[in-house]
Structure formats: C-alpha cells, structure tokens
Amino acid sequence: MTLVDKFVTHVISESSFEEMDRIYLTNRVLARVGEGVLEVETNLDKLIDLKDQLVEEAVRLETIEDSQTAREILGTELMDLVTPCPSQVNRDFWEAYAYSPEQAIEDFYQLSRKNDYIKLKAIAKNIAYRVPSDYGELEITINLSKPEKDPKEIAVAKLVQASNYPQCQLCLENEGYHGRVNHPARSNHRIIRFEMVGQEWGFQYSPYAYFNEHCIFLDGQHRPMAISRQSFERLLAIVEQFPGYFAGSNADLPIVGGSILTHDHYQGGRHVFPMELAPLQKTFRFAGFEQVKAGIIKWPMSVLRLTSDSKEDLINLADKIFQEWRQYSDSSVQILAETDGTPHHTITPIARKRDGQFELDLVLRDNQTSAEHPDGIYHPHKDVQHIKKENIGLIEVMGLAILPPRLKEEVEQVASYLVGEAVTVADYHQEWADQLKSQHPDLTDKEKALAIVKDSVGAIFVRVLEDAGVYKQTEQGQTAFMRFVEQVGILLD
C-alpha cells in the first residue's frame, strides 16, 4: 500500500471521516505534501510514523523547506485531519463528563496522544531515573525531548517582524494556530473550556510532558501570574473537578517563579511526586482552624501541609498564612519581606485530594539576592550550578529534577574521566569530576562509574533544593520556621 493510502486509511479509521471522504482526504494530503508522493510505498504502520514519513517526503520534494519549523507546521496540519474541531472536542468531553469525569479526562488524554499533540516519540528520548536521599526517593530527568533550533532558524527568528498574536504560548488563540519560526505550530491543538470561580479557563495537555498526564489549566484571558486567595480557591476547585489530578502553581515572583509569568496558569497531572510522600515531622493546629490538620513535612524546602474535608477552611487558612508570609521578616536567618517596597515573599502552592480529604502544600519562597549570591539567596548556589542553574519551579519543588540536555554527554564524559579515559571534561565540571575521582581512585568499570556519576547528580539536586529552602535543615533553621508558624497563630499545648 502506498504511504498516502495508508495515512488516509488511518485518518478514516481514527476520526469522523468516512470511506466516501477518501478522495477528498487524499487531495488534502497531496496539497500539503506534493503530488510526487502519490506513488511512494511504505512499510510503516503507525499513524505518527506515517505522518513523519510524509513530512520527510515533503522536504525531499521541496514542497517545504528543510527546517524544523517547516516540519512542525506540516506535521501538525496533517494530524489536524484526525482531530475533531474544538466545539466537537468540547461537546464530547462534557457529554462524557456527565456520566464519568474520569472517562472524559481519559478520552481527551488519548486524543492528545493519538493526534501527536503530546510528543510521545520525543518524550521517550528523555533520561529518567530515581535516587535515594534523606528525603525519600527523588526523580531525575535529563530533558532531551524539546528540539533545539539550528543556528539558521535562530538567525531567521531575529529577523521576523514582531507579532503579538498569540500573545504567548498559553493563550487560547494558540488553538489551531499555523505556527511560525518563533512560535510553535498548533494546528492539532485542542483546549477544553470550563468555568472556574466565575471565569473561563482552559484545560490542555503539555506537549513535552515531564510526568504522567502532565496538563495545564490556563486563564481564558492573558493576565499575569498572581498568587492570591483566588489561587487556593482555583487549585482546590481543579482537584475536585478533575478527579485523580493534583494541581499546583508556580510562584509569581522572578527567581523563584516559573518560566512563564505573563499568563496565569496552573499545572497538574496524574503523578505521585516525592514531596507528596514526605511525612509530617512536626504537627500542630492553627488557632481558629482547629479542624485543619497542619504540620511541617520532612523536605529540603520549607513546606506547610494543610489537610481538611472543608475547602473553605483550607482557603481561609492558606490565605492567612500567605498574607503573614508576605510581610514577615526574620533578620536572624536572612529572611526579608521586601526591599524599598519590592516584595520578596510568595508561595508555591500545590493541591491534591487524598483519602477523601483536600490537601494543600504551601512552599515558602523568598527571592532576595545578595553580593554573595547575585542569582538568589534561595536559589541554586554557584557550586551546584554546573548541574542546575535555572529557577526552581513547581515541578522541581516537588522533587522532580528537570536537567538540561547538555548533561547527557557531560555525565558520560565525567564517567569516562573516572575510569582513566582521555576525555575532555567541561571546565565547570572539573572540580566535581576531580572530587569523584579522589573518592573512587581505582575505578575501572565504566557502568559502575556512570552509576556513581548519576547518583552524584541526585545528591547535587538535593543540595539544589536545600539551597532553595528558606528555612535550613538545622536546629537554627527549624526553630526559626516555628517562629513563623507561631506568628501565624497556633494552639499551644
């Protein structure tokens, strides 16, 4: 069977198109790929593989230019053929939701996989492993899924006339967007609309997922990130409306926030993060909220966990803690609420529903800088930035390291160095490599060396999180943490 015939057969079997539409679909494919593909045979069987071959044929036929951007644009256009229109996707979702919210979510997830919006083949390239620590098992990923632009495309992007449509990658206007060299193609993108706390929001999956069913809840309007009482209301509304999913927000200040601060959004998914498994190491009750179980969890960052079957109690208490933290200073442990009116304090909140109760984790954040730590006092310090120098956002806070692609090769180089091979180690890794070599001077087994290096990366990630923690894992730090808790107001024994 020819490539086009196979692809069209898949489209018919996996969409609302019928056999009568075969000629129409064939012509739609030829219009995009080029008529020279008509006689091309294929041994491939899977829809996404067939799409990828069609894209390469379009490059061969010079229908599209040989660039990542052109490939992405054509690929999403082809997969749009198996994707119902937005109104139909929403209709199907809410009709299924009326009978089973879980089934509605599952159906939308499977659609986002089937139509290649979730980039399964790219995600499979990521390196992922777990490492033991004093705080339980942590998750390490080296992110290889996001394709990097080549120098030519980067140069072209600089020359492209500025456009504010869509305003950012989270706007509703991305749904069906053709794409350009400096904005991703989204022809096959679909968003579920829903109302939350009186406003329109969208629910979509993340194309380059970092964990199972990684999804995004985005404001229907282009509004900046802001942590407020509404954040707690929305997060708890999400975990109630989307059963089985957690929901969390990045902080809303530079250094401690995520990469997108211009559009209010939350992240969620069906994944148990290491932080969720962290036990309470100290428990107490807040005055006026006796029905809320509260405590500090055993975690490298500073986290208050609140649990209750009352959403209202959780929202009120979380807001009280947040308002107190925004204005709280303690010079004895270098905690400062503001400098000349510029705020330093915010919270990274995470919500989940567990054993029938609502749970909120409030991670205290401080974005101060100093002469010693110009990138941030509570940010990865210089000696660990060879592994992680980017902001510690929501996902890392919960114990999943997202490390840059460069580390794949660099980790292997350090392992080779440990067994005495003649390799060049990156300057910023040399001190680390020498330290590991002094600890393992007689190492000859390459696999064992690689395991040692990977474990060391995990140990450094623990340090990264400890650096980001405002109250350190010392007697002084934990005593200071309790001073803040007492400032909020707890019941004394």
UniProtKB/Swiss-Prot annotation:
The places in or outside the cell where this protein is found are: Cytoplasm
Q: Which Pfam families match?
A: GalP_UDP_tr_C (PF02744), GalP_UDP_transf (PF01087)
Single GO MF annotation: UDP-glucose:hexose-1-phosphate uridylyltransferase activity
Pathway membership, UniProt = Carbohydrate metabolism; galactose metabolism
Query: Where mainly located?
Result: cytoplasm
E.C. number: 2.7.7.12
Which controlled-vocabulary keywords does the entry list? Carbohydrate metabolism, Cytoplasm, Galactose metabolism, Nucleotidyltransferase, Transferase
What name does this protein carry? Galactose-1-phosphate uridylyltransferase
Which organism does this sequence originate in? Streptococcus pneumoniae serotype 19F (strain G54)
